Amino acid sequence: MASRAGPRAAGTDGSDFQHRERVAMHYQMSVTLKYEIKKLIYVHLVIWLLLVAKMSVGHLRLLSHDQVAMPYQWEYPYLLSIVPSVLGLLSFPRNNISYLVLSMISMGLFSIAPLIYGSMEMFPAAQQLYRHGKAYRFLFGFSAVSVMYLVLVLAVQVHAWQLYYSKKLLDSWFTSTQEKKRK
């Protein structure tokens, strides 16, 4: 295609798309945050499955109590922490704000609250282990309170990041819906 400006008309060489074809920032952010939350949900699922396995072995007495101790009380309500993760996953396909809000609220109730209770429940045993070097519950030869505190710290971090990213995703979705209402 020839023109007076030269062999090719200006703007037809493919360089004119940069000012037109851009994905809105809140859509880019939504995709990124969904991916991060999914990764955290999968890490939470691994923690949850390990906890279920430990509790099953303890209750079914598949191994002696010298190897696997009975579960702490905080572990039972923590089993419900799978509910917020499922609600979070259900909110992703259609950007369902109500499921995401339910996920965030139930995460505080079913995930964070049992972890706080667990840290308080295990504190006397951890204090005794630190001061006197005596442990009464064991998990494959290790002090159960030490192992469970490591799990607890990891779970707190996973849920805190999950809440943080969920809040940012919620803000991103609100931006998107506000722009649609203006049009």
UniProtKB/Swiss-Prot annotation:
- Protein localization: Endoplasmic reticulum membrane
**What residues form the membrane-spanning segments?**
40-60, 72-92, 97-117, 138-158
- A Pfam family (short name) is Jagunal
Could you tell me which residue ranges are on the Lumenal side of the membrane? 61-71, 118-137
Explain what the UniProt record notes about the effect of disrupting the gene for this protein.
Lethality around embryonic day 8.5. Mice carrying a hematopoietic lineage-specific deletion of Jagn1 show defects in neutrophil-dependent immune response to the fungal pathogen Candida albicans. Neutrophils display defects in the glycosylation of proteins involved in cell adhesion and cytotoxicity as well as impaired migration in response to Candida albicans infection and impaired formation of cytotoxic granules.
Modified residues annotated as Phosphoserine in this record: S3
* GO cellular component entries: endoplasmic reticulum; endoplasmic reticulum membrane
The protein's superkingdom reads Eukaryota
Q: Which GO terms describe its biological process?
A: defense response to fungus; endoplasmic reticulum organization; granulocyte colony-stimulating factor signaling pathway; insulin metabolic process; insulin secretion; negative regulation of insulin secretion involved in cellular response to glucose stimulus; neutrophil mediated immunity; neutrophil migration
Give the membrane topology, semicolon-separated if more than one.
Multi-pass membrane protein
Checking InterPro entries in the record gives: Jagunal (IPR009787)
Question: Which sequence ranges are listed under topological domain Cytoplasmic?
Answer: 1-39, 93-96, 159-183
Please verify whether the record's keywords include Membrane: yes
Q: Which cysteines are joined by disulfide bonds?
A: none
Q: Which UniProt keywords apply?
A: Endoplasmic reticulum, Immunity, Membrane, Phosphoprotein, Protein transport, Transmembrane, Transmembrane helix, Transport
Tell me if Endoplasmic reticulum is a UniProt keyword of this record: yes
Q: What's the subunit arrangement here?
A: Interacts with COPA, COPB2 and COPG2.
Its biological purpose: Endoplasmic reticulum transmembrane protein involved in vesicle-mediated transport, which is required for neutrophil function. Required for vesicle-mediated transport; it is however unclear whether it is involved in early secretory pathway or intracellular protein transport.
Q: Please give the family membership noted in the entry.
A: Belongs to the jagunal family.
Q: What is the designated name of this protein?
A: Protein jagunal homolog 1
Source species of the chain? Mus musculus
Species classification: Eukaryota, Metazoa, Chordata, Craniata, Vertebrata
